[in-house]
UniProtKB/Swiss-Prot annotation:
Entry superkingdom: Bacteria
Function, as annotated: Catalyzes the reversible isomerization of glucose-6-phosphate to fructose-6-phosphate.
Positions annotated as active site in the UniProt record: 353, 384, 513
Pathway involvement of the protein, from the record: Carbohydrate biosynthesis; gluconeogenesis; Carbohydrate degradation; glycolysis; D-glyceraldehyde 3-phosphate and glycerone phosphate from D-glucose: step 2/4
Regions that span the bilayer: none
Swiss-Prot/TrEMBL catalytic activity: alpha-D-glucose 6-phosphate = beta-D-fructose 6-phosphate
CDD domains to which the protein is assigned, alphabetical: SIS_PGI_1, SIS_PGI_2
Segments forming a coiled coil: none
Family designation: Belongs to the GPI family.
Protein name: Glucose-6-phosphate isomerase
Molecular function as annotated in GO: carbohydrate derivative binding; glucose-6-phosphate isomerase activity; monosaccharide binding
Organism taxonomic ancestry: Bacteria, Pseudomonadati, Pseudomonadota, Alphaproteobacteria, Hyphomicrobiales
Gene label: pgi
Compartments (UniProt record): Cytoplasm
Length: 549
């Protein structure tokens, strides 16, 4: 079935009318009227609980959203992705990061080739190499064991691997892993300052092997090895993860240490491919397979579960409701798990690079707001930073809480109890708020003066009725992390379907790159600053004058 544009417009119109009705978004009233609201508005998948009962929706809202999903042909486009059809239309590519998670005994034919065999072949090479590094049988040029890995990449070659490696710290039993992404020389300088060239291995992670930031950092690392160990050491201390095998070889990396991935794997979805080599080195191949298995479970759930019980689809519909219908311009990601402190930054790329688009699949301007601003921090830090804004700011920001029932430190369970209590409390406080009247009576009971109490009560009252979603799993493990990440991948894909955009390209990042290439020789004094705007000319002049001084 193709999208039904007429039915979609009617569904959108019905939703916009529905949101204006009295009490539709009154979460507190919904709970007072329905004792079964939590049961009706939550979904479970094994130990994963997806609770959206604190969103301003009713059963009627959900039905209208389901109608919208049907009109947009969410199920048909889901099938198109899983069958390998070209859904990245502007780049004419299939979108098959899901294939990277398939079991080894599956078959997936793309262009007359079983890509599962290709995937498993690269995975087997990753396993063999990681075991050699981890057991010490792979030696550096001087015969010493490799103790430190430096992953050089940016965007999807950095955000995912760095986040996952940090999140799975309790499972680390391999070499120390470091990440360099910025072209700011301070980044690689500070990392290398604490490392020994003889025991350091570099992973150059770049799909095209042309990304400026990555290649500049790789050259610095190459020179560092060359100056300390000699040119012959370069091939021993570097591996590459890339689609551009020839460019990696030209850089000086032996073909046996180049791990391939394919053009049907988008950068921000590449953690499941050889880009995840650094993760495997840190946690071992069995834990890495569990990571893939967790994502596979969510893939299966997304593929096979009916619409009304499908967590990624329901998650996406709520995101559409908040962004397009309610007009909330951002969403806050708040993991109450310190090891997921980098998860919001990872989701920023996954979400905003995917759905930060202004034209439809047909190349026409979109008439409603698309992807929201995605931001956040770990829960404990957030409470002492931006939660004031969430509770009393003039903008309503839906919050997505991520919580785990248990921690990895059983001797410190009392601290985890405090963490859980704070997460649940913030979710409840955002919804319930505190009225001026309640605050006033409390102040008066504490012996306050009437006029002063009345004024102070305005400052201390909270409107409440602020929506939030809660995602709870038992424990942060490779499996549960993989499942969580796949959930967000599919949610963002479905939101893109509802917005009628291509979630798998990123043309918006190209113009800045072009301008940077034009400006670099100007900054170096090699070219004149022709055809620049007045502001840029002024900035260039200031920088050049200050540099001379």
């Amino acid at each position: 079935m193709l999208p039904d544009k007429k039915a979609f417009k009617e569904s959108l119109k019905a939703l916009k009318k529905h949101v204006t009705q009295d009490k539709v978004c009154d979460i507190r009233q919904h709970f007072s009227e329905d004792e079964q609201r939590f049961a009706r508005l939550s979904i479970r998948l094994d130990d994963l609980l997806f609770d959206f009962s604190k969103c301003g929706v009713t059963l009627d809202t959900l039905q209208l959203l389901d109608n919208l999903a049907i009109a947009a042909d969410v199920l048909g486009k889901r099938e198109a992705m899983f069958s390998g059809k070209i859904i990245n239309t502007t780049e004419k590519r299939s979108v098959l990061h899901i294939a990277l998670r398939l079991a080894a005994d599956k078959v997936f034919i793309l262009n007359d080739r079983d890509i599962v065999q290709d995937i498993q072949s690269v995975l087997a090479r990753m396993v063999k190499f990681s075991k050699m590094i981890r057991d010490g049988s792979y030696k550096g040029y001087s015969g010493e064991r490799i103790t430190d890995i430096v992953n050089i990449g940016i965007g999807g070659s950095d955000l995912g691997p760095a986040m996952v490696t940090s999140a799975l710290k309790p499972y680390h039993d391999g070499p120390h892993c470091h990440f360099v992404s910025s072209v700011d020389s301070a980044h690689i300088t500070d990392i290398l300052a604490d490392l020994n060239p003889a025991t350091t291995l570099f992973i150059i992670a770049s799909k095209t092997f042309t990304t400026t930031e990555t290649i500049e950092n790789a050259r610095v690392a190459r020179q560092w090895i060359h100056s300390h160990l000699g040119e012959n050491a370069v091939g021993v201390h570097f591996v590459a993860v890339s689609s551009a095998i020839d460019k990696a070889i030209e850089f000086g990396i032996d073909s046996s240490r180049i791990f391939e991935f394919w053009d049907w794997v988008g950068g921000r979805y590449s953690i499941w491919s050889a880009i995840g080599l650094v993760v495997m080195l840190a946690i071992g191949d069995q834990n890495f397979r569990q990571f893939l298995e967790g994502a596979r479970q969510m893939d299966q759930h997304f593929k096979d579960t009916p619409l009304h019980q499908n967590i990624p689809i329901r998650f996406a519909l709520l995101g559409f409701w908040h962004r397009v219908i309610c007009g909330y311009s951002s969403r806050a990601i708040v993991p109450y798990e310190q090891r997921l402190v980098r998860f919001p930054a990872y989701l920023q790329q996954l979400d905003m690079e995917s759905n930060g688009k202004h034209v439809s699949l047909e190349g026409r301007p979109i008439t409603f707001s698309t992807g929201p601003v995605v931001w956040g921090d770990s829960g404990s830090n957030g409470q002492h930073a931006f939660f004031q804004f969430l509770h009393q700011g003039t903008d309503i920001v839906p919050v997505e809480f991520i919580l785990f029932v248990k921690g990895h430190e059983p001797n410190l369970n009392h601290m985890h109890d405090i963490l859980v209590a704070n997460c649940l409390a913030q979710s409840e406080a955002l919804m319930k708020g505190r009225s001026h009247e309640d605050v006033y009576h409390t102040l008066m009971n504490d012996g306050g003066e009437s006029d002063e109490a009345d004024n102070l009560a305005f400052h201390k009252s909270l409107q409440g009725n602020r929506p939030s979603i809660m995602l709870i799993q038992d424990l942060l493990t490779p499996f549960t992390l993989g499942r969580l990440m796949a959930l967000y991948e599919h949610r963002i894909f479905v939101e893109g379907i509802l917005m009628n955009i291509n979630s798998f390209d990123q043309w918006g990042v190209e113009l800045g790159k072009e301008f940077a290439n034009e400006l670099l020789p100007v900054i170096r004094g090699e070219n004149e600053a022709d055809n620049r705007d007045g502001s840029t000319l002024g900035l260039l002049k200031h920088i050049q004058n200050r540099y001379v001084e």
